[in-house]
């Protein structure tokens, strides 16, 4: 097959995940790919010339973010335009702390439960304050546990995916993923959460228990002044669901009578809404016309075999993957004199390249050269991206000097 990502570039994909073993160049590849897409117009029959600029959002899901380093620009948890490509490319780095510092956690610590207690007797006021302090202490423990909870990185990333699942703000989302293990847990989340919700909602007594608990918490927190605890709906952590959940509006705003509560019907409605959104995410994951995974590796034993395990897992989750980028290849012009170290590296790499060609003969395998310098900044990323759509030939292109090319 064509040893480039040209077919990917001219597709109408909406989500592209870039992943692989740590240290193989995932971030460089995803940033270069985002730059390439952002500078390539998208077909639009309504536009005068039949095309329009493609709006791309690059999201880092790796807890150790590197997008800021690759672009020489600071990014945060909100989409930020990339300098030089402000109209077509934005980037963001998902921060799990934003997920655990939401309104739900704040409310549990009593941050929103202030108000006047002048109408209460001294005894009632003291009891209410003591109860609220107890909930605050419990909330603080829950908050700290949430920050360090295993899987919180994947859950926070999934919350961002839910947020953008129905947005039309961007034509394409590119995910610079964490190393393989984190990424597989992320991709498995829709199935895992769906089955979990099914089991929970099959428990007939669950919703009434939550309803009773919400009334208890609401009466305790609302006793101090009767103010409602805003933003305490169950789906606070999922950005997209807070405004769209059918029948769930009263969970957050229906506390106007001075207590925080949620009914059994609202619990069921919220759970059904979550399930619907997650099924939509799952459908998009499994649609090769909308989602694709680009594997990145180097021609060494550990990387090649981890890539094979990754491809097998992607097949298990029914996620499309037909592109592999092999980075850091020692490719020398044939006219160059032999180098003992280079020859040794080439021998190792040739061995694993043969295995890659054998295993993935129906994949687009892009072979990228080892460069003389780091790839940082838009000019260097554009130079790198050139060889994602044009096979590198050392006799034709010679050595690629990043600094001179920029």
Swiss-Prot record:
One of its GO terms (molecular function) is ATP binding. It comes from the Eukaryota. The keyword Endoplasmic reticulum applies. Zn(2+) binds at residues 339, 342. The keyword Iron-sulfur does not apply. It is found in: Cytoplasm; Endoplasmic reticulum. GO terms for cellular component: GET complex. GO terms for biological process: tail-anchored membrane protein insertion into ER membrane. Pfam families: ArsA_ATPase. ATPase required for the post-translational delivery of tail-anchored (TA) proteins to the endoplasmic reticulum. Recognizes and selectively binds the transmembrane domain of TA proteins in the cytosol. This complex then targets to the endoplasmic reticulum by membrane-bound receptors, where the tail-anchored protein is released for insertion. This process is regulated by ATP binding and hydrolysis. ATP binding drives the homodimer towards the closed dimer state, facilitating recognition of newly synthesized TA membrane proteins. ATP hydrolysis is required for insertion. Belongs to the arsA ATPase family. Keywords: ATP-binding, Cytoplasm, Endoplasmic reticulum, Hydrolase, Metal-binding, Nucleotide-binding, Transport, Zinc. Homodimer. It is an enzyme of class 3 (hydrolase). This is ATPase ASNA1 homolog. The active site is at 62. ATP binds at residues 21-28, 300, 327. Its EC number is 3.6.-.-.
């Amino acid at each position: 097959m064509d040893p480039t990502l040209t077919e990917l570039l001219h597709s109408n994909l909406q989500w592209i995940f870039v992943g692989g073993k740590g240290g193989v160049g995932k971030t460089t590849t995803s940033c270069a790919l985002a730059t390439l897409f952002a500078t390539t117009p998208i077909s639009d029959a309504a536009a005068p010339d039949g095309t329009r600029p493609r709006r791309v959002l690059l999201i880092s899901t790796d807890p150790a973010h590197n997008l800021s380093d690759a672009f020489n620009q600071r990014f945060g948890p909100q989409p930020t335009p990339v300098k030089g490509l402000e109209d077509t490319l934005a980037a963001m780095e998902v921060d799990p702390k934003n997920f655990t510092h939401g309104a739900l956690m704040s409310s549990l610590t009593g941050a929103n439960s202030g108000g006047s207690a002048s109408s209460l007797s001294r005894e009632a006021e003291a009891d209410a304050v003591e109860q609220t302090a107890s909930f605050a202490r419990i909330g603080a423990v829950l908050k700290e546990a949430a920050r360090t909870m295993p899987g919180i990185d994947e859950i926070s990333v999934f919350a961002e995916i839910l947020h953008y699942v129905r947005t039309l703000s961007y034509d394409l989302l590119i995910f610079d993923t964490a190393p393989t293990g984190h990424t597989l847990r992320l991709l498995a989340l829709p199935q895992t959460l769906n089955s979990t919700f099914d089991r929970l909602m099959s428990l007939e007594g669950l919703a009434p228990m939550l309803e009773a608990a919400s009334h208890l918490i609401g009466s305790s927190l609302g006793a101090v002044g009767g103010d409602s605890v805003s933003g305490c709906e169950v789906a606070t952590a999922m950005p997209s669901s807070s405004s769209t959940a059918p029948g769930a509006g009263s969970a957050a705003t229906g506390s106007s009578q001075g207590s925080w509560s949620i009914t059994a019907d609202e619990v069921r409605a919220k759970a059904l809404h979550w399930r619907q959104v997650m099924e939509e995410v799952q459908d998009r994951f499994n649609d090769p016309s909308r989602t694709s995974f680009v594997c990145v590796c180097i021609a060494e034993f550990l990387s090649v075999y981890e890539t094979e395990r990754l491809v097998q897992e992607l097949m298990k989750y029914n996620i499309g993957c037909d592109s592999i980028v092999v980075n850091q290849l020692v490719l020398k012009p044939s006219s160059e004199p032999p180098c003992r170290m280079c020859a040794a590296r080439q021998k190792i790499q040739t061995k694993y390249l043969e295995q890659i060609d054998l295993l993935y003969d129906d994949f687009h395998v892009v072979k990228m050269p080892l460069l003389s310098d780091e790839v940082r900044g838009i000019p260097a990323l554009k130079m790198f991206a050139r060889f994602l759509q044009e096979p590198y030939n050392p006799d034709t292109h010679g050595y690629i000097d990043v600094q001179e090319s920029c």
